[in-house]
């Protein structure tokens, strides 16, 4: 997504978006281990940078801050995701700046975070995790305190409209309006962002 971008569907609900202008995946992990993904700081054209802006993927409120300058932003209302109309939480970590205070509110598209190298980190990056929920008052963490409650694959929580896909990995990233794969379907040959969409987005003038 782009700075100050707001994407609202025809029913009035926001669309959950990838929160940066460029996606450059740090490590392409096996699918069973990708509830948390790391992204490197790059410009909208894919060039290295420092302190890459991170925009609110939806209008929401900070509901948690903790170690590694991490924080959780929760949507104020249900938003469109590839999994349906859900409440969404996103955990981000490692900014060099202190996270926003709990109860801080951010409009979709507003910058609320940056990449960094703070805490348990091995180079500047953005660590990010998503959870999708039906109940906005649900617990924040899984039993044992590791991992977001309701955690999910990132491509099941957001869309990548208006994001430059420099290194997206081989995952099912979708544009809003596309149909997610059928659960249980053999997607090995289909896995990955469609080449024709990727090519069109790479050629798009920014």
Task: Identify the function of each model-found stretch.
Residues 1-74, 78-81, 107-108, 117, ...:
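Surface-exposed, glycine-biased beta-strand/turn segments
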Residues 46-49, 96-100:
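Short alpha-helix capping/helix-loop boundary micro-motifs
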Residues 61-63, 93-96:
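Conserved positions in beta-strands of structured domains
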Residues 84-93:
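A short macromolecule-binding patch
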Residues 99-110:
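Acidic, glycine-anchored pre-beta loop/turn
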Residues 123-131:
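Histidine-centered catalytic micro-motifs
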Residues 131-168:
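Short peripheral tails and domain-boundary helices/loops at the edges of structured domains
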Residues 188-206:
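Enriched but not universal
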């Amino acid at each position: 997504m782009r700075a100050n971008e707001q994407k609202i569907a025809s029913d009035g609900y926001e669309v959950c978006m990838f929160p940066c202008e460029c996606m450059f995946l740090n490590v392409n992990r096996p699918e069973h281990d990708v509830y948390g993904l790391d992204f490197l700081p790059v410009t909208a054209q894919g060039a290295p940078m420092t302190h890459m802006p991170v925009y609110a993927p939806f209008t929401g409120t900070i509901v948690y801050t903790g170690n590694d300058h991490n924080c959780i932003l929760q949507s104020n209302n249900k938003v469109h995701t590839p999994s349906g109309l859900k409440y969404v939480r996103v955990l981000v970590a490692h900014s060099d700046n202190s996270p926003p205070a709990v109860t801080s509110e951010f409009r979709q598209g507003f910058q609320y975070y940056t990449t960094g190298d703070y805490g348990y980190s091995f180079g500047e990056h953005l660590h990010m995790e998503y959870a999708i929920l039906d109940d906005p008052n649900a617990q924040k963490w899984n039993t044992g305190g590791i991992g977001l409650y309701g955690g999910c694959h990132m491509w099941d929580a957001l869309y990548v409209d208006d994001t430059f896909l420099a290194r997206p990995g081989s995952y099912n990233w979708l544009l809003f309006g596309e149909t997610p794969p059928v659960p249980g379907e053999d997607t090995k040959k289909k896995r990955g962002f469609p080449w024709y969409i990727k090519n069109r987005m790479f050629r798009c003038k920014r």
